[in-house]
Every structure is written in structure tokens, then in C-alpha cells.
Swiss-Prot record:
Disulfide-bond pairs as recorded: none
Originating gene: thiE
Lineage of origin: Bacteria, Bacillati, Bacillota, Bacilli, Bacillales
Residue numbers binding 4-amino-2-methyl-5-(diphosphooxymethyl)pyrimidine: 40-44, 75, 113, 142
GO terms under cellular component: cytoplasm
Isomerase as UniProt keyword: no
Superkingdom field: Bacteria
Protein's recorded name: Thiamine-phosphate synthase
Co-factor requirement: Mg(2+)
Length: 212
């Protein structure tokens, strides 16, 4: 059963985010040991795996998450999420509409990216379990990221969505997480600050301290 606290420290990662000399399996295991509360498999960009290689990797990482009782979410790829029976799916504004697949994801976690009021007003949140708001800060992890909206956008959208869980995303690091923790966000989505940390487990511990 999905709860807002599952968003506390939400790790998003694919092979494209892993520094040289490391593997995604190593990094994810260390992040799980550190206490991440949710993991999203986002395999896209230069050098990302495709086809059966992507499926095989997803299954391997899914099993790792299961051993730590951490939900495994697939970014964007509805077919993959169905094929491996993932715990949920996260889609953006330009991806497949939630209305098109929600009936195939009953009992699963559905997340939607929302960057501003216009996107919120254009979105049907009937079947959405949480929204990802951002980019809060400038982000190096997404080539297609739009302009940063700042922590204030969380409060702007909170007034509109009530108790719907909100996770902040985009450029979040240990240097700026305190600004997000002061808002009504239920947690933070983090890519590079965890994936590229020389001390992954310790970094996750530090993020968790802001969302107890």
C-alpha cells in the first residue's frame, strides 16, 4: 500500500547516471542499504540499454529492490512496467496519458510529473498517487529539463492538490535539500547526488534526516 512517506528519499537512476568504474547494481545496493524509500528505473539517454538488455537489467534491479522491500517504479515505459509486473509507473507530461493505461495498473503506484499550474490544470489526477514537482533547481541529469521552478512551486501546487503526495525533483543535493525540506513536499527525488556520490549509503542517510 503506497504511503506519502514512500517518497521521503526517492532514488531515480539508470546506467547513464553511473560514474565510470561503478555498476548500477553496486550503486543501487548501497542506496538500498542506506534506506532509500522508493526506486525508479530510468534508463534513457546516451548509452542507455534497450530491448531485451533493458528488460533483463530491470528484472535484476527489481529483484534487488524486492529483497529490501522497496517499491520498484518504471519511468515512462508502460510496456516494460507491465511485462515485469513493476510496483508502479511514472510518466511525464509528454508521455502516455494516465487515462490510457490506468485500468492496467490497478493497485499499482502511478506518478505524474507536473512543473507548474498550467500543467496541473491540464492533468487528470483521478488515478494519480503522487506528483513529481520540478525541476526545483537546475539539473545536469536531464537534457530535456525545463527552467527551474524553485521550492515555492511546491506550495503553489500544494494549495491546489490538497493532501495528494508531492515529491520534489530536479537538481536536489545535500547543499540545497534544506530549502525543500522547509516546504510541504513529502520527499525528494534524487539522481546524481546519490548515483555519483563516493559514499552512497552515507549520502542517503543524510537525505533521510530531512524527512523523518
Amino acid at each position: 500500500m503506497f504511503q506519502s512517506k514512500d517518497l521521503n528519499v526517492y532514488f531515480i537512476c539508470g546506467t547513464q547516471d553511473i560514474p565510470e568504474g561503478r555498476t548500477i547494481q553496486e550503486v543501487l545496493k548501497e542506496a538500498l542499504e542506506g534506506g532509500i524509500t522508493l526506486y525508479q528505473f530510468r534508463e534513457k539517454g546516451n548509452g542507455a540499454k534497450t530491448g531485451q538488455d533493458k528488460v533483463a537489467l530491470a528484472k535484476e534491479l527489481q529483484a534487488l529492490c524486492k529483497s529490501y522491500n522497496v517499491p520498484f517504479i518504471v519511468n515512462d515505459d508502460v510496456a516494460l512496467a507491465e511485462e515485469i509486473d513493476a510496483d508502479g509507473i511514472h510518466v511525464g507530461q509528454d508521455d502516455e496519458a494516465v487515462d490510457d493505461f490506468n485500468n492496467r495498473f490497478e493497485g499499482k503506484i502511478i506518478g505524474l510529473s507536473i512543473g507548474n499550474l498550467e500543467e496541473l490544470n491540464a492533468s487528470d489526477l483521478t488515478y494519480v498517487d503522487y506528483i513529481g514537482v520540478g525541476p526545483i533547481f537546475a539539473t545536469p541529469s536531464k537534457d530535456d529539463a525545463s527552467e527551474p521552478v524553485g521550492p515555492k512551486m511546491i506550495e503553489t501546487l500544494r494549495k491546489e492538490v490538497g493532501d495528494l503526495p508531492i515529491v520534489a525533483i530536479g537538481g536536489i543535493s545535500l547543499d540545497n535539500v534544506q530549502e525543500v525540506a522547509k516546504t510541504s513536499a513529502d520527499g525528494v527525488s534524487v539522481i546524481s547526488a546519490i548515483a555519483r556520490s563516493p559514499h552512497v549509503t552515507e549520502t542517503v542517510h543524510k537525505f533521510l534526516q530531512y524527512f523523518k
